[in-house]
A protein has these predicted regions:
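Compositionally biased, intrinsically disordered low-complexity regions used as flexible
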Residues: 14-15, 46
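Short, Lys/Arg-enriched N-terminal segments with co-localized hydrophobic residues
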Residues: 15-30
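Metal-cofactor-dependent catalytic cores
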Residues: 27-295
């Protein structure tokens, strides 16, 4: 079940609900409007609101997010999050770019082998800690207590739970951005728009602008991996923050509504069949008939 996304999430716009599976007469008929596309880049975000981390490749597991994507969050005031019974919480409970744009001024890195999380500011290391130990989490919490006091509603606390992701939606999905749609937004804004404003997992090159909205209900094939496109992503004020300068320099949701009649960009997809995907891999649409034959 999909939970509302704080200040962003809503139902899929009626004008996009017709993007279900396309029926074809036979397996020989080409899938209409199926342009060649590939994965341009892959990113994860180990701590919600903090730095994107590029991945050359990643192993996907059915029904899960990217490994360690939004694995941690920084609680901003009591959330009653229970690590023994983790449940979706709206982003308002955490430090986040929608309200706390200064987060983008930090350069952070999470090391999978050691669970060490490092924070740099202006190229200088300012905090480091093991996020799987109480002492290490305290080191990171102390940094935010000192440096983000004006943003805090209570003591900052690093939250995590096995298998849980602090995503903006309750379902475990991956997010996909069409780079041509970002280019269309850039044209409307009249100035460069860094695709990382959208904090997606898979960035796709080759689709026409807004083509992703026609894929709702379709299954994407990336080698042996299968992804089911589930839902448009509604955008909020987080995309107004430049990921390099940390300045809130644009009002992209307003620009999108004015120029395109919506504030959606990208889609969520569920991992149906797992495997490894890499930057440069081609993306195809699996026909409904082939899906039935393989089921």
């Amino acid at each position: 079940m999909w939970e509302p996304e704080f200040a962003c999430e809503r139902g899929t716009p009626e004008k996009f609900t017709a993007g279900g599976a396309i029926k074809r007469k036979s397996l020989e008929d080409p899938m209409p409007n199926n342009p060649s596309a590939k994965i341009a880049s892959i990113y994860r975000y180990p701590v919600k609101g903090l730095s994107p981390e590029p991945l050359p490749s990643v192993k996907l597991t059915p029904g899960q997010t990217l490994p360690s994507d939004r694995r941690y969050a920084i609680e901003n005031g009591p959330s009653k999050f229970d690590p023994d019974n983790p449940k979706y919480l709206p982003k308002a409970y955490f430090l986040m770019l929608m309200r706390n744009e200064r987060l983008a001024s930090l350069q952070t890195h999470f090391d999978d082998a050691t669970n060490i999380f490092t924070i740099r500011h202006n190229g200088r290391e300012v905090a480091q800690g093991n996020l799987e130990t109480a002492e290490g989490r305290a080191d990171i919490e102390d940094y935010f207590r000192r440096e983000f006091s004006s943003d805090l509603k209570g003591a900052p606390k690093i939250l995590t739970a096995p298998g849980h992701s602090f995503s903006d939606v309750s379902a475990k999905v991956v997010s996909i951005i069409n780079l041509a749609s970002v280019a269309a937004i850039e044209g409307a804004a009249g100035q460069p728009v860094d695709p990382l404003r959208f904090r997606s997992n898979l960035y796709v090159d080759g689709w026409p602008g807004w083509h992703e909205f026609s894929l709702l209900g379709e299954t994407l094939a990336i080698g042996d991996v299968r992804l089911k496109v589930k839902k448009n992503i509604v955008r909020c004020a987080a995309i107004n923050v430049d990921p390099v300068t940390a300045e809130r320099d644009l009002n992209l949701p307003k620009t999108m509504v004015q120029h395109f009649g919506h504030d959606d960009c990208g889609v969520y997809a569920e991992i149906i069949t797992g495997g490894t995907v890499a930057a440069g891999d081609m993306i195809e649409i699996v026909s409904p008939e082939l899906q039935l034959q393989s089921s």
